[in-house]
Structures are given as C-alpha cells and as structure tokens.
Amino acid sequence: MMMGKEDLGLSLSLGFSQNHNPLQMNLNPNSSLSNNLQRLPWNQTFDPTSDLRKIDVNSFPSTVNCEEDTGVSSPNSTISSTISGKRSEREGISGTGVGSGDDHDEITPDRGYSRGTSDEEEDGGETSRKKLRLSKDQSAFLEETFKEHNTLNPKQKLALAKKLNLTARQVEVWFQNRRARTKLKQTEVDCEYLKRCVEKLTEENRRLQKEAMELRTLKLSPQFYGQMTPPTTLIMCPSCERVGGPSSSNHHHNHRPVSINPWVACAGQVAHGLNFEALRPRS
C-alpha cells in the first residue's frame, strides 16, 4: 500500500482542526512519477483491483480515504494543526483577559495619579493667581505717589518697592491697575457729560422745529397779509396845511396822509402859493 503511494507520487492531506479550518491539499509530484508515466503507454488502462488507485482531484474523497490519508499526512498538516491550536489558546487567553477586572484595577492607579497631578497643577495656578494684599499705609503711600506721578521709571520703582517692602513687579502692576481704573472712571464721566449734552441738544432741536413749523403755518395763512402795516405815509407841516386850505377831517390834522409822491405835492403847493402872491394887490 505504501509502495503504491510512493509510485503514484501524490500525497493528499486533509487536516481537520478544532476550529474547522479549510481543507488543505498538498499535491507534490515526485521524480519517480514522471519516470513511470514515461514508461507507460497512453492507451493503457489501469486495473481497479490493482494497488494503484485512481484519484480524482475534482471529486471529494471518501471517508475511508480520508482516514487512511490522515495517518500519512504531510508535515504541513501537522504545522497547521499546531498553529490552529496555539491560535485557539491565544484567543481563549485574550477572551478571559478582556472579561477580567485585573486590567481595570491596573488602570485605576494611573488615572488616580493623573488626577492627582492635575489637582496639584490647579492648586499651583491658584496660588500663583492670588491677589496682592496691601496694608493701609502702603495703599495710602501708593495713592499719594500716583497723584504726583502716574508713571514711574525703573529707579523710582525700585526705590518705592524697597521703601514699601515690595517687589518692583508688584509696584508696576499696581500702577498699571490704578491707571486703568482712572481711565475707566474718566470714561464714565465723559459718557455722562456727553449724554447730558445730547439730551439738551435734542430738546433745543425739538423747540426749533416747532418754531419753524409755526412760521410755515403763518406764512401760508391769508390773515398774515391783512395784519401787515400800511405803506409809508407823508406828514404835511402845519404851514403847508394852512396854505392848502382847511382839511376835510376835524381830527388828526397833524397826521393827515397825502400822496406817496412828495414832488407832485410840493409842486402843487408852490404853484398855489404863487397864485396867491399874484392876486395880492400891489401898494
């Protein structure tokens, strides 16, 4: 049986693992097979009772053949089964590791350590952001200095910091904040003043608009022309009035209106006077 398989030179191996891996077939022709095929004629038929069996590669092998072949399987099938077994063991270990709580216990200290570090950093940031506490004497002295000079040069900063037992940076920050507060207060005062000016100008604008509307109404009304003063009148002197004759009116003799053209009136009065002189008798 074994010799017949060696002559045939075909080794069929089917490895079945626990994980039902796909069928693996190893067809390796040997040199003896090529020699035997060269010796045999092509029209020769094989005896089915002989030791040499026909193997149809395209058909699925029977159970008996599989059982016989598994006993003489190639080393590749052994290696594949070993690899599949290791793979199953590895999967089982990984599955138990995921479900266990040991990993969570190992991560927890790291998280706690990271939280502790962040808490320490936050505490350090809070201490660095603490406000400067000044005494009443220090505040009063700084206010007096600010009234004299709202800005300081480096020498003045060092001298003031040494005198008040502070650092130059603290003095500089205090002056910056004080200037900012002063500017803010001045801005608020200017804003209030501008608001009052705007309100006053708004009222004045409303008053002027009202007066302009009243003037337009009077200009368009017809009574405006009736209330106008009469045109210019001439006043005659008493002597001319006596020469001209008695007035038809008994009152307002001194304010009798005459013609608008003064030259015509004067010419008539002169001519009238000359007539009287001509009629006067000569002595």
UniProtKB/Swiss-Prot annotation:
Gene3D superfamilies registered for this protein in UniProt: Homeodomain-like (1.10.10.60)
Induction: By indole-3-acetic acid (IAA).
GO cellular component assignments: nucleus
InterPro entries noted in UniProt: HD, HD-ZIP_Homeobox_LZ_Class_II, HD-ZIP_N, Homeobox_CS, Homeodomain-like_sf, Leu_zip_homeo
Keywords for this protein: DNA-binding, Homeobox, Nucleus, Transcription, Transcription regulation
Biased composition (Low complexity): 73-84
Membrane-spanning ranges: none
UniProt-annotated location(s): Nucleus
Domain of life: Eukaryota
SMART domains according to UniProt: HALZ, HOX
CDD domains (alphabetical): homeodomain
DNA-binding region per Swiss-Prot/TrEMBL record: 127-186
Pfam families associated with the record: HALZ, HD-ZIP_N, Homeodomain
Single GO biological process annotation from the record: shade avoidance
GO molecular function, one term: DNA-binding transcription factor activity, RNA polymerase II-specific
Region Leucine-zipper: start-end pairs: 194-215
Disordered: annotated segments: 64-134
Entry function: Probable transcription factor that plays a role in auxin-mediated morphogenesis. Negatively regulates lateral root elongation.
Subunit note: Interacts with RBR1.
Similarity field: Belongs to the HD-ZIP homeobox family. Class II subfamily.
Full protein name: Homeobox-leucine zipper protein HAT2
Annotated source species: Arabidopsis thaliana (Mouse-ear cress)
Lineage, opening ranks: Eukaryota, Viridiplantae, Streptophyta, Embryophyta, Tracheophyta
Gene: HAT2
